Amino acid sequence: MSAPPWSCPLPVEEGLTEEGLLKIRRGTVLRRPGRLTPLRAVAHLAAWLPFILGPARLIQHGWRPVGDEAAIALRSWSELTAHGPMVGQATRLAHGVFDPGPLEYWLLAIPVHLDTVHGVLWGAVICCLVACSLAVEAAWSVLGAAGGLCASGLIVGLMVWMPDIAITPSWNPWFGMAFFIAALAAAWAVVSGHRGWWPVLVITASIADQAHLMFTVPSAALAILALIVGLVDTIRGRPGYWWVVTGLIAGAACWSAPVIEQFTSRDGNLGLLLHSSGGAGTGRQTGGAFSLKALSAAVGPVPIWWKSQQSSAIYQLISHRPAGLAVAVLILVAVAAVMAVRPLRCRPLGALALVSLVISLGALVTYSSIPVHNTSLLTLGYLIVLLFPVGVLSWLVVGTWAVLTARLIVSRAAARSAAAQRRGLPADDGEGPAGQALRGAGPLAGLGAAALIAVGAILAVALQGPTVHRVTADPAMAASVAASRQIARALPGQPIALSIHDFDASALGRMTLGVAWALTPDGFRAEIMRARLARELGTRYVFRGGAIPRVKVRVRPHGTSIAVTRPTQLASHR
């Protein structure tokens, strides 16, 4: 199959050969030549650069997994044991439940066994690099170099706006975001007629979905939309259902653990998630008005992602946005999708408009379901990451639709004028000075876009400095290392009851999880005496009063100390 063009063609006359669900002829302008291979390399390398240098700087500054990263490392370690988790991380978007599945743990299980200190970080880096390349290649399959550079630019722009994603990609929201971008590109490819990308869409959407609950609705909707379009394409004369079978097998493998857990547990996690999606057990939620305002913040004239992230005031900024703007933009995107069928006859635009519309509606569902009881919206500031692809795709769709519509109007007006003035003269073959200039401008535009993306990647790396310093300055890192070393010297590997005292309350949980993980490779299993924190790791880590050593860690300004109470000592005090 020949490579797709860079641009959409003008409408074709009746009787000409047309292809695909939308009956749109492929363009013949600026096909992808071999000399554009360097652009492909730039697209990949620019997307990779922040993910490589950010974690490398973390490791150089003495990073250790604490908090959620420690929990992810510990649960990934358990995947190669008889007690592997079958659900994801504990989520704040519902009470007492977990993210849908353990795919992130499956992917990081081998790295954390190979390197117990940094494996969770560099393992996540490798996974995110693969996700970035999948996004670039999927977009490249649609529009050649233009598509690949757009995908790379989307990734780089996201890294500029939110540097944390590339610095700590092991954190499950950031891990899921990388694969959500890949799912967007794969969905665009499938809806554009490249059905072979549907299995990739199923896998990447499943990883994003299971990594964090905020991706669940958009990811599932993308997979279903692409399946429907692909099936219609197949029925309309493109035989072969191998892509459906492959995708379904991949989906069954990805969702085997959550489904098994659902039917073998008394309270299955998937059932609890469905139950809580209607607000049951979560109390008051943000609601539809807030979700429309959030979407307005993403697509407005001065979008929220246009400025540097200010998570401390993010929800105040959203609450002042007009809800009607989101409705207007959704209507424009829907109009663009319809006009892409006729009169524009541009399938890539129609596909992108459908993808944009689906993730926008999915984001509305997500942002309307954020619980506001027993939590602060400020603690969930990372959820705004979903606004970036929503806003950028909406802008891209509306802008492209406006340009192609203007081009169509001008071309039709010029055709009528030329027909009136030169009636009876031979038709122009379209290869006049204007057509030659257009062909010559294509490579220059590609080089300019590649240079701009490369500069953006360098800027993204330059903006990582403050975040690297903030992350590595966490006092829980040094304290957890000191405490775990003292415990390992005092006791052989065994189950222990762990408690942390005299430490900063805001970092107490992060240190506790950091110590629990640091001890695990040495044969310890820390049963945490803070039940709520322990349940985030699983029931095996909840202290139930057994006859095991109790380890009390005290963190004071002059140093860290431990006190061990053995079972015999406990019995003598009774």
Task: Name the predicted role of every residue range.
Residues 34-35, 140-147, 194, 231-245, ...:
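Membrane-interface helix-loop-helix junctions at transmembrane boundaries of multi-pass membrane enzymes
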Residues 54-56, 71-106, 110:
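Extracytosolic helix-loop segments that constitute the early lumenal/periplasmic catalytic or substrate-binding loops
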Residues 75-78, 233-234, 242-329:
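Transmembrane-lumen/periplasm boundary regions of multi-pass, lipid-linked membrane glycan transferases
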Residues 122-144, 182, 339-340:
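Transmembrane-helix motifs of polytopic, lipid-linked glycan transferases
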Residues 135-160:
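Transmembrane-helix signature of polytopic, membrane-embedded enzymes
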Residues 183-198, 208, 234-236:
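Membrane-interface transmembrane helices that cradle and orient dolichyl/undecaprenyl
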Residues 198-215, 219-224, 250-253:
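Membrane-interface alpha helices of multi-pass inner-membrane proteins
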